[in-house]
């Protein structure tokens, strides 16, 4: 019988996601034209569906929008080739890329002519695709990938690394350690690229492990940071699980695994309305379960301001 639900804090929307959503809303509010968004604005189906209801059209490729259309790039960023293609077609361009992802792009442009670059990230992820479009890079996802680069890296040319902003802090440390062992001459950046929100949400989950039986992560299946939260929780609490919506909740799973104290967190692209719906359903299953903010939690205080000019 579930007795208590501890809420992790921070959880849910990060500053970059809020920035991207606000960006689209502001462009739409100031335009009478059809607004197109390339790819999912953030990796959450509920957010995308709500925008569709408000008239936003989502496309996977620029070819799906007419010449001269207003197109906004998602929070994950795009490669320079995509930007150039939009310009060639006379499109009005809005860039809702998270400022922390933009920072990684700037770093890539700065060093692309002087350094060999290893990119720590997930193949096929929208953010990785966009960043790797800035320069020639070697993608690594595992320790084995690093070993395979031995014959590809020139020891006589400077080497450094960049990383996807939504990675597991612990796993990335292991990869960086292996890079250092394999390539002792590597230049370490003064600061890693994992964003504050990813780090803080993982730290919040780690703090709860000794006080819970399992962690419930709310997030989309294609949300990298949500999957990292689940992996982190399962290392200590194997019965931890993830749902995308309240419909995914299973009372039987909680009962069968004898979960009495449940931690709850949400990925950085998960809206609060989903969190509220899932808590409500848990309370229907277990009316006597107490819902509490986990002691020692802290708020997410970062905020990004929208630029004065939204379209170029």
UniProtKB/Swiss-Prot annotation:
GO terms for cellular component: cytosol. The active site is at 127 (proton donor). Keywords: 4Fe-4S, Iron, Iron-sulfur, Isoprene biosynthesis, Metal-binding, Oxidoreductase. Isopentenyl diphosphate binds at residues 43, 76, 125, 223-225, 269. It comes from the Bacteria. Transmembrane segments: none annotated. [4Fe-4S] cluster binds at residues 14, 98, 195. Belongs to the IspH family. Catalyzes the conversion of 1-hydroxy-2-methyl-2-(E)-butenyl 4-diphosphate (HMBPP) into a mixture of isopentenyl diphosphate (IPP) and dimethylallyl diphosphate (DMAPP). Acts in the terminal step of the DOXP/MEP pathway for isoprenoid precursor biosynthesis. This is 4-hydroxy-3-methylbut-2-enyl diphosphate reductase. It comes from Leptospira interrogans serogroup Icterohaemorrhagiae serovar Lai (strain 56601).
């Amino acid at each position: 019988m579930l007795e208590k639900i501890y809420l992790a804090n921070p959880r849910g929307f990060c500053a970059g996601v809020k920035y991207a959503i606000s960006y689209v809303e502001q462009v739409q509010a100031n335009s009478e034209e059809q607004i197109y968004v390339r790819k999912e604005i953030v990796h959450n189906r509920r957010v995308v569906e709500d925008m569709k209801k408000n008239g936003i059209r989502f496309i996977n490729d620029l070819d799906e929008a007419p010449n001269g259309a207003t197109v906004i790039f998602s929070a994950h960023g795009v490669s320079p080739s995509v930007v150039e293609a939009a310009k060639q077609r006379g499109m009005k361009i809005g860039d809702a890329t998270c400022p922390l992802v933009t920072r990684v792009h700037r770093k890539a442009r700065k060093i692309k002519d002087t350094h060999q670059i290893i990119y720590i990230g997930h193949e096929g992820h929208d953010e990785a695709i966009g960043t790797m479009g800035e320069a020639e890079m070697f993608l690594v996802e595992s320790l084995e990938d690093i070993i395979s680069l031995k014959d590809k890296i020139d020891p006589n040319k400077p080497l450094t690394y960049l990383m996807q902003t939504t990675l597991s802090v612990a796993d990335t440390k292991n990869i960086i350690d292996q890079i250092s062992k394999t390539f002792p001459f590597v230049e370490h950046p003064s600061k890693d690229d994992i964003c504050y929100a990813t780090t803080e949400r993982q730290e919040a989950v780690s703090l709860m492990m000794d006080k819970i039986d399992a962690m419930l992560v709310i997030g989309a299946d294609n949300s990298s940071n949500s999957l990292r939260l689940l992996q982190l929780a399962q290392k200590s609490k194997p019965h931890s699980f993830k749902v995308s919506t309240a419909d995914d909740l299973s009372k039987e799973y909680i009962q069968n695994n004898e979960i009495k104290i449940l931690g709850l967190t949400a990925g950085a692209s998960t809206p609060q309305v989903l969190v509220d719906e899932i808590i409500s359903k848990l309370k229907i299953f277990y009316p006597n379960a107490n819902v509490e903010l986990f002691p020692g939690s802290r708020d997410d205080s970062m905020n990004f301001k929208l630029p004065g000019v939204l379209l170029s």
